[in-house]
Structures are given as structure tokens and as C-alpha cells.
Amino acid sequence: MSKRYKQLTEKIDVTKAYSVDEASLLVKNLVSAKFDETVEVAFNLNVDPRHADQMIRGAIVLPHGTGKTVRVAVFAKGAKADEAKAAGADIVGTDDLVQQIKDGIFNFDIVVAAPDCMGLVGQIGRILGPKGMMPNPKTGTVTPDVATAVKNVKGGQVNFRVDKKGNIHAGIGKASFNADKISENLITFVKAINRHKPSSAKGRYIKNCALSLTMSPAIKLDVMQLADMK
């Protein structure tokens, strides 16, 4: 453990489960890097993703965005292509965009597709899938309303998906955000997780949750408080 990391650890009471407001204030005191660190949240859920009805996946637009500039590629044609461009899409195409991806050029972070272009997107599913870029209706990235999808993604939409161990990780802001913005983004994200609770899930749904910065130790959150956020 480095001296810097040890000093940060000493600021956290490891025996305590912090409220959202307390954690949002404390995480501001853990800034140590020379860059604008990402505020990260990690959940451990009491679900078994091997069961289809317990595969937690979705998207949420955070009220204050993520602080990250997101580049969006859109598969659309005709009027839908024009709408995507007007909404601020960085790249809009069809066959040309397929070829670009086949050539290994990824000058974008997220892919959105109109439903009538999913046949094209299917040609490159094996490329996009492993990169986590495959458009999906559950995250709002396959939709006839491509303009809204682009605005949501640009405006701070966070996609989330539980891993095989029941964990969800996401960036919900930057260290430069004030504590209120961090708190409001976190509450919005927690509510989204709670809305996705499977009816078949037994016992405590959110088993553990922690808030941290890119280079900081984790702050344990009070899961009883989180459970009441609907």
C-alpha cells in the first residue's frame, strides 16, 4: 500500500456504513490524482444472472451527466439519419459504417441503431459484442427515435449490466462535481437498480454498495437506506 493510498484510507471509517449524503461529501475529500477522477459506484446484488429473469440490465440518464464526452455512432438512413445528425451524432451511416468497423476504426464510444438497420448491425455483432457496443432495446440504443437516443447518451446516460457474480459497476460523475450533484446522480442510479429488482429475488436485494474515485479506497454505503429508494 502506497503512502498516499494509506493516507486516504485513514479518512474513512471502515466500521461505518455511510449515508448517500455523507459518502458524497467524503468522496470529495479523497481526491489525490492530477486528473479529474471518475466517481464510481459498485453494487453487489443478491441475484443469480444464470437465470434469465435475474439478468439485470438497463440504462438511466443521470440528472447531472457523467462529466464524460461521449462519441456516438448511429446506424440510420433517410429521415432518421437526418434526425440523428441534428441531435448531435458524431457518425451516421449504414454500409459505410459497417465497413469502417470491419476495418477496425472505432472513433466512437456507443452505437445506436434504428430497427430497420439491425440486419446490417448483425453483420458486425461479433465485433461489437465483445466491446460492449452492440445496440440493445433494453438500453434504449435500438429505437426508431434515434434523436432521443443520441441526446440521452450525450446527456449522461449510463448503461448497466450485472456480471456473473452479481456485481454492477458504473461511473456516475467526476471528482470536480460538487457533493450535491454526486448525491443526486447516485440516488438516481440506485432507484434504477431498485426498479430492476426481479420478482424472484429473495432476501436483501442490494447486499453491498460502495462509492469511490478512480484512485481512492472505497466508501461503504448504508444498504438499508438504499433499499428504501424507489
Curated annotation (Swiss-Prot):
Xref: Pfam families: Ribosomal_L1
SUPFAM superfamilies named among the record's database cross-references: Ribosomal protein L1
UniProt superkingdom: Bacteria
Any one GO molecular-function label of the UniProt entry: tRNA binding
One example of a Gene Ontology biological process annotation: regulation of translation
Alphabetical UniProt keywords: Repressor, Ribonucleoprotein, Ribosomal protein, RNA-binding, rRNA-binding, Translation regulation, tRNA-binding
Listed PROSITE patterns: RIBOSOMAL_L1
GO cellular component: cytosolic large ribosomal subunit
InterPro entries: Ribosom_uL1_bac-type, Ribosomal_uL1, Ribosomal_uL1-like, Ribosomal_uL1/biogenesis, Ribosomal_uL1_3-a/b-sand, Ribosomal_uL1_CS
Quaternary structure annotation from Swiss-Prot or TrEMBL: Part of the 50S ribosomal subunit.
Its biological purpose: Binds directly to 23S rRNA. The L1 stalk is quite mobile in the ribosome, and is involved in E site tRNA release.
Record PANTHER family: 54S RIBOSOMAL PROTEIN L1, MITOCHONDRIAL, LARGE RIBOSOMAL SUBUNIT PROTEIN UL1M
Family statement drawn from the similarity comment of this UniProt entry: Belongs to the universal ribosomal protein uL1 family.
Protein name: Large ribosomal subunit protein uL1
Source species of the chain: Sulfurimonas denitrificans (strain ATCC 33889 / DSM 1251)
Gene coding for it: rplA
